[in-house]
């Protein structure tokens, strides 16, 4: 699957052996959740960026029955999914909308997930060629007292993390 095929929805749908009608968005569910932090990070986050605990979860259902999910931090990514964007997306083709950055990060992520699943293609292939076999993960926190940072580093090591990042 090449990028030109992704941009040309008709050839993309044909390439995946799917009817464009199976990519029609029939439902969008949104939920806002308050994410808990462990005690030490919570003290630091409450001091600096308390709004980071709020996230939006979005589930998109396509006419073919495929569901895609996406998530985004309400105050960190490029936008929350508005009621207007939900109304705009319902009834439209997910492959045509998935590149629309105005829809909100969580909805856009859910569209990529649904289109990828509909075509039995990993979502990363919709963005281009795979570059790596694995993705390194870091344990992270914002600045905090030395005692708390030591506790966090020990927890990260115990859980197998090889990198610790502080913001």
Language model features with spans:
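N-terminal amphipathic alpha-helix/helix-capping segment at the start of soluble metabolic enzymes
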Residues: 10-29, 116-117, 121-134
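Structured beta-strand/loop patches that form or line metal/cofactor-binding pockets in enzymes
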Residues: 12-69, 73
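Conserved active-site and cofactor/substrate-binding residues in soluble primary-metabolism enzymes
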Residues: 20, 52-53, 98, 102, ...
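A short, structure-level motif marking secondary-structure boundaries and short turns
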Residues: 44, 96-98, 136-139
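Metal-dependent enolase-superfamily TIM-barrel catalytic cores that perform enediolate-based chemistry
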Residues: 128, 132-167
């Amino acid at each position: 699957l090449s990028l030109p095929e992704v941009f040309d929805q008709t050839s993309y749908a044909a390439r995946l052996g799917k009817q464009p009608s199976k990519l029609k968005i029939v439902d969008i569910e949104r939920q806002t959740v308050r994410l808990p932090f462990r005690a030490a990070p919570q003290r630091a986050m409450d001091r600096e960026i308390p709004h980071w605990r709020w996230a939006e979860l979005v589930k998109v259902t396509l006419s073919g029955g495929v569901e895609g999910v996406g998530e985004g931090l309400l105050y960190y990514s490029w936008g929350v999914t508005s009621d207007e964007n939900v109304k705009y997306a319902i009834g439209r083709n997910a492959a045509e909308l998935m590149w629309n950055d105005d829809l909100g990060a969580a909805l856009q992520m859910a569209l990529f997930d649904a289109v990828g699943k509909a075509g039995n293609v990993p979502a990363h292939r919709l963005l281009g060629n795979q570059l790596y076999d694995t993705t390194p993960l870091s344990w992270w926190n914002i600045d905090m007292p030395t005692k708390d940072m030591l506790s966090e580093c020990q927890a990260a090591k115990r859980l197998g993390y090889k990198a610790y990042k502080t913001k």
